[in-house]
Every structure is written in C-alpha cells, then in structure tokens.
Amino acid sequence: MLHEVSFQSFNERDTVYGWIYVPAAPAKGIVQLIHGFGEHSRRYLHMIVKFMDAGYIVAADDHVGHGKTAVENGTWGDWGDKGCHTMMEDEHTLTLIAKEKYPGLPYFLFGHSMGSMIARDYAAKYGSELSGVTICGTCGVFRGASETAQKLSEAIAQGRGKESDPSFTADLLGWMCEYCGDTSIGNEWICSDPYVQRDHADDPFDAFTKPTTNQSMYDFTQMMEVINGTEWAQKVPVSLPIYNIAGDLDPVGEYGEGVYAVTNWLRSTGHNVKTKLYSGYRHEIHNYNDIKDAVEAGVIAFMDENL
C-alpha cells in the first residue's frame, strides 16, 4: 500500500509532499528515510523495497526546494526564510503523520548526507521519540563551511538572499572531486559507478539542476554548524542507539576522519554508537551494485536489534 501525504512546511510557505510505503505483511516498525542535498526521496526505491521486505513501513518526503515539493510549489533551490531547522521540523511533522496512521510501532530514522545532518538535528530535539537512528555519509566539521557562511552572510546583508550565486556552491562543494580523476560530469565524488553519476546528473528531479538561493546555502552551512561537537552530542538522548556508516573515500566525511569525529563526540558523551566504514567506496554506499545489499542488510539488522 502507498499513501501520498502532504503538509504545511515549517517555512510557512510551501506544501511538502511525501509518501508512506506499507508492506503487505504486518509491520514490525517504521523507518523514516531522509534524503540529501540536491536529490529526492525516490532515488532510494531500492532501499525502500528492502526495508518493506524486512517488515518496515517507510515514510519519506521531498524537502523544501527539492523534488516534487519544489515542482509543486515552484521553489527549486529555495528553502524559505525560517532558518536551518526547517527541514528537521518538516521531518518531525512527517513522523507525527506516520505515527498517527500506524501507532505503537518502533520508529527509526535513516538519513543520508544532508539527510544525516537533519537526522542528527532531529535526534538532538526529538530523540526521545525514536528507537534508533542510522546516519549515512555524514560529516564532521565540514571543510570550508565557516568561511563560505561568512561570505553568504555578507551577501544576505546586502539584500542578495533570494539571489542564486553559484560561486558560493563552488566554494562549499567544489573541492569534493579532488581525488576522483575524471571529473567531466562534476558529481563523481558521489560514486565511482558511471551509471550512478549519469543517472544523478540527468534526473530532472535532482535540485542540482537548479541553483540554490544564497539564503538557503547559508542555512545549509548552519545545519552543519548546529550538529558539531560535544555540545550537539549532549543534546541527544544517551539511550538512543546510533549506527554511523560511510565510505572511506567519501569527501563529505573527510575520508573517514569526519565520520569518526562524530562517533567520538557521541562516545565521549556516553552514547551507544556503532560505526562502519566501507573500504574503497565514495559517498553513496547504498548505490554501489556490489555492496548495496550488504549496506541495506546492515541497517535492517541494526533496526531489528533495537525493536
């Protein structure tokens, strides 16, 4: 069964569009899938099917400025002006909708890339409502974020918040192909599989096809800021299990260093966190044909252990 849902965004402007995928057999839990920057939730259909086959209801939406939500609202790359917690609060609204439809089930988050940042922000505010969180392809202190944030802040102060200046995106993300060799497409850092690169680049629902506003890029840098260090980790309930996974060739996680920084912040504040790095793989470990089944099986096993 598939429910299409919609709700008012925290930004007080957009309608957010989402889906709840329900397996035929009675469900043992719910997992909410949170997609990353410049993509949309239906890039995860393989994972969604695997989660359903394992007995989980899956809830997912397209963030403001992304995917169907951007198409229906005419707001490609524009996340609104309510700040860096907008997407996190929208994800919590989706949680409430899913829980109302299917009450009493253990509830998990899976967040990839920017989605992992949203999941970490969510865990700091609403973690007591969850049974576990998987963060995939997350970051530590993101390289160049503070410097880019300062430039964006100056542009916004000059009244350029609604403009889209690609140079800021280049400042923040342009270095990530530094070890990729061929960079003819520009997204090679996500995966070494040319099919995945081309599919991502050609997908009309990927927000990388449209420039992101300066205000939204600033909010993106602040999303990174609020989930840094032990100050963030102390806000996450100690009882919340966390599974931290990534590829060791992923620039978002500084090739493992940032991934382990997150684990160390959590462990130093008494948290239960399990970490797994996949050797030889870039950002989208769930899209490599040779390991995606194992990646998904690992997430399912983590959830099964924490029902």
For each feature predicted by the language model, list its residue ranges:
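N-terminal cap/lid segment of alpha/beta-hydrolase-fold proteins
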Residues: M1-P23
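Alpha/beta-hydrolase-fold enzymes
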Residues: D121-T209
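Conserved alpha/beta-hydrolase "acid-adjacent" motif
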Residues: P251-A261
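Short beta-strand/loop motif that positions the catalytic acidic residue
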Residues: N244-A246
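Conserved alpha/beta-hydrolase
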Residues: S41-R43, I48-G74
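Alpha/beta-hydrolase active-site loop
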Residues: W79-K99
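Active-site glycine-rich loops that stabilize anionic/oxyanionic intermediates
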Residues: H35-E39, S113, D248-L249
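Catalytic active-site module of serine/aspartate enzymes centered on a nucleophile-bearing elbow/loop
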Residues: T269-L307
